[in-house]
């Protein structure tokens, strides 16, 4: 059997119970923090030498030189060529859908000219180099390659460098095939905090990047947090989440399996169902019990559902949307009639899946939108990974002679009000000196 929390929004203690359910303290392990700091410091000072030492210690790969840790491009093509046709076709179709979607996100530089000839605008520039971390070994995450590499390529990033560990020399061909499809420029068989450090600081072999993206274990996540500021990072991700709003008319087995799809990630993942239909909630609960025993990862699912998940009865769909906005979930399914109507009421969610046939898993792999999403209620102020994460914006200001006089006078007054005399004089010189010299 399995015991999942049952809550009702009508209970006087509901807000407290919901807050306790959502609470996730991403505690920092002092030993882990110290270990990561030591690894990063050694990579920064010793470069390739430290990288080889850590690769031998953690991955048990005895490379003779750091250059041996880089895979040749033909190795990626070989992995793609050796894939079974069905797998290759699925990867290529998913990649194309992700590419088409992200091309819609491209923004262009823009400018305008004021009547006095002053030119103002914004220049869009892709990053010079980005780093992509991909878990390796038996854990195959080709979808992570697609979701992180394709937006970078669409943005026009100059060079994309991928790192992926190969424990005991075990190379994951699915990951390499995905890298080939995405035209990743360089691939290094390194992982852990040492790989993050190499990307952030650079070594004689591994080039320094401007931004690091991609998922990883606690060491990788901690290392990304440590190097943030030296380089950019995508986000600090918490456990996976799904919130399902259902009117009670969807097949309960579908809803139960959608909850499983997040719960199987890890024991801290969260799956919540909101429905005004109590009978439907009970039917979903029964489906969970019935289907759980068929799941290969049933113990992980069980722990997640028992400790961090809930079945919640709400007054109506209006209230369900209000609660959803409070939760700001990573994934939100609107399994209801007229989902287009209800999505207008949603303000905070990483990705919103509309209708009964739109399972969250489709978004994870091949629908097109990115699956790198804000977690832990950060969808209140954060967005999915996208092309814009690999672009920078620079302001363009070209003031005409006539504009200099007008703006200089304004700037001078404001600068003097702030007690910054040099600012004021810098603004004034552009037009007072012209007047004195009789120039236009």
Curated annotation (Swiss-Prot):
Pathway-wise, it operates in:
Amino-acid biosynthesis; L-histidine biosynthesis; L-histidine from 5-phospho-alpha-D-ribose 1-diphosphate: step 9/9
Active-site residues? Answer: 330-331
Record's keyword annotation contains Oxidoreductase: yes
Q: Could you tell me the keywords of this UniProt record? A: Amino-acid biosynthesis, Histidine biosynthesis, Metal-binding, NAD, Oxidoreductase, Zinc
Which cofactor(s) are needed, names only? Zn(2+)
| E.C. numbers | 1.1.1.23
Q: What class of enzyme is it?
A: oxidoreductase
- Record-listed NAD(+) binding positions: 133, 194, 217
Residues noted as binding substrate in the record, renumbered to the chain: 240, 262, 265, 331, 364, 418, 423
The cellular component terms of Gene Ontology attached to this UniProt record, alphabetical and capped at eight, are: cytosol
Q: Which reaction does it catalyse?
A: L-histidinol + 2 NAD(+) + H2O = L-histidine + 2 NADH + 3 H(+)
Instruction: Spell out the Pfam families in the cross-references.
Output: Histidinol_dh
Which PANTHER family is this protein grouped with? HISTIDINE BIOSYNTHESIS TRIFUNCTIONAL PROTEIN (PTHR21256:SF2), HISTIDINOL DEHYDROGENASE HDH (PTHR21256)
Q: What is this protein called?
A: Histidinol dehydrogenase
Source species taxonomy = Bacteria, Pseudomonadati, Pseudomonadota, Betaproteobacteria, Nitrosomonadales
